[in-house]
Amino acid sequence: KTTTSTLVAWLNRALTGGGSAFLGGISKNFGGNLVLGDGPRLAVEADEFDRSFLRLWPDVAVVSSADADHLDIYGTHEALREAFSQFVGQIREGGALVVKQGVDLKIGNPGIRVYRYSYDEPCDFYARNVTLLEGGHYRYDLVTPGGVIEGCTLGIPGWVNIENAVAAVAALWCASERDGEPLDAERLREALASFEGVKRRFEFYVNTPRQVYMDDYAHHPRELAAAITSVKKMFPGRRLTALFQPHLYTRTRDFYREFAEA
């Protein structure tokens, strides 16, 4: 969520010259997690932890996951899913929902547009012709309902961040469609390439042919599995040593089997 929302803020700044943001991590491009600027667009990282996302009424919403989490708050996965459905129901009339392919949500408001995104599975927004470059970066073409944006590269490595970039571009595409301002493909490519990431989100401190040291905030089994898979794809055949920090007693208690499998 943090990388995707920070990407939305950075891409919006590049495309419009303005915009504000409330982010859940420290953006390296902006030098903080609060961005204040001109223009009507505001990027917010919504949080389901204490149901605070139900205080938001977005024009465009991105849902990257509705996995079981925060069961100390919700009690059951079904109760969490109901909260996500309520959040989706708060999207403004004429707005848009961008949801990850495979995430099952109840969508009860017919007055919004619904789009699916994925890493490379064909749907409304996805990456194709993905090529691994030196240092774990990727080149890819980004497919949108309005056409293909070719030759994209992201300033940070990892295949999971390609998926985040697809989601962020989808959000900007929806906002631009609503405002009648088509995306500028060249400026979008430049903004993706200049994105520096977020502290503690797949952050590399050492990246040499002999040694690599990186830090990631992945604190859910599925996030952890995605981070480990990304590292293995970037450095095939290399020895991987992982230091795991349990985050919240209740989450560790509820998902210790899934953490072990990840």
PLM feature spans:
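Short, acidic Gly/Pro/Ser/Thr-rich loop/turn segments
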Residues: 49-52, 68-71, 122, 135, ...
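Short, basic phosphate-binding NTP loop
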Residues: 4-9, 13, 122-128, 151, ...
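Generic structural signal for helix capping and beta-alpha/helix-loop junctions
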Residues: 29-30, 124, 250
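Nucleotide phosphate-binding/pyrophosphate-handling subdomain across enzymes
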Residues: 135, 140, 145-262
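Short polar/acidic secondary-structure junctions
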Residues: 51, 119, 131-132, 145, ...
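Beta-strand->loop->alpha-helix junctions that form or flank phosphate-binding loops
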Residues: 21-25, 100-101, 111-134, 153-159, ...
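Phosphate-binding loop of NTP-binding sites
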Residues: 1-101, 105-113, 166-175, 235
